[in-house]
Design a protein with these regions (language model features):
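Generic, well-ordered alpha-helical scaffold segments in large soluble proteins
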Residues: 6, 10, 18, 62-70, ...
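Active-site C-terminal subdomain of aminotransferase-like
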Residues: 1-96, 105-107
């Protein structure tokens, strides 16, 4: 899961990783630059935290590019669909009648429904039956099971899950229902930056990703930009001696 955090300028030396700041280039245009990088953290080790591996940024990039590709309307559509699955499933549970009375634990939820099965025996039975056919549910406690829906959920999943809990396969309603309290709904604009409203086809997305890649400095385009401090900002010809036997 990607994580994002903010901090004041005063606290920046306590933050791990590389910090990117907004500056201006030689022509006065807005530009991004390293405001605090590994080397500075190394030199000022008494005032800054040691650098922490930033490989986790891949997850943040994936989450960011997901938002770029789908845009605000796409993200809303996906979220509404997921919530509709959860709402419809909860309604089936609420309307279930039988010897074992099921109930939905929470009135408000987004994608996850916690079902109280009324007894440990029934909860164990449902949980094991689901596991046997490849559904990974969460045993909330002795009598409760948590069911989470996602973008990958489909109508067949809905039929199987309702069959597991109420012994009757239900169809997903044609109309989506939103049961969130109005106080939890955002009314302001989201993802309003142009980048989230420009690349919504595969070729547009690939071209955008390629343009970002081309901004990076590489050996075949310029000098060596990253690596050991002894190798930074050296032209290729200056690096040749490291290959000499002597």
């Amino acid at each position: 899961h990607a994580a994002y955090f903010a901090f004041s300028d005063k606290a920046k030396r306590s933050a791990p990783g590389r910090i990117i700041g907004v500056s201006k280039d030689s022509q006065g245009n807005t530009a991004l630059r390293m405001a605090l990088q590994t080397r500075e953290q190394h030199i000022r080790r008494e005032k800054a935290n040691s650098n922490i591996c930033t490989s986790q940024v891949l997850l943040a990039n994936l989450a960011g590019m997901y938002a770029v590709y789908h845009g605000p309307s796409g993200v809303k559509r996906i979220a509404t669909r997921i919530h509709a699955f959860a709402t419809a499933f909860a309604e089936v549970i609420r309307q279930a009648n039988g010897e074992n009375k099921l109930s939905v634990v929470h009135d408000q939820f987004f994608d996850t429904v916690v079902v109280d099965c009324g007894s440990e025996k029934l909860a164990t039975q449902i949980f094991e039956n689901a596991d046997n056919i490849g559904y990974n549910l969460w045993r909330f406690d002795d009598t409760k099971i948590s069911v989470a829906f996602s973008e990958t959920s489909d109508e067949e999943d809905f039929k199987v899950l309702t069959q597991l809990f109420v012994n009757t396969s239900h169809q997903l309603p044609e109309t989506a229902s939103v049961s969130l309290d109005q106080t939890h709904l955002r009314n302001d604009d989201i993802l309003s930056h142009p980048v989230f409203n420009s690349h919504h086809t595969e070729h547009e997305m690939l071209r955008y990703l390629k343009s970002l890649e081309d901004r990076d400095l590489a050996m075949n385009r310029s000098m060596i930009a990253l690596g050991s401090c002894t190798m930074k900002l050296n032209a290729t010809s200056e690096m040749l001696p490291i290959t000499w036997p002597e």
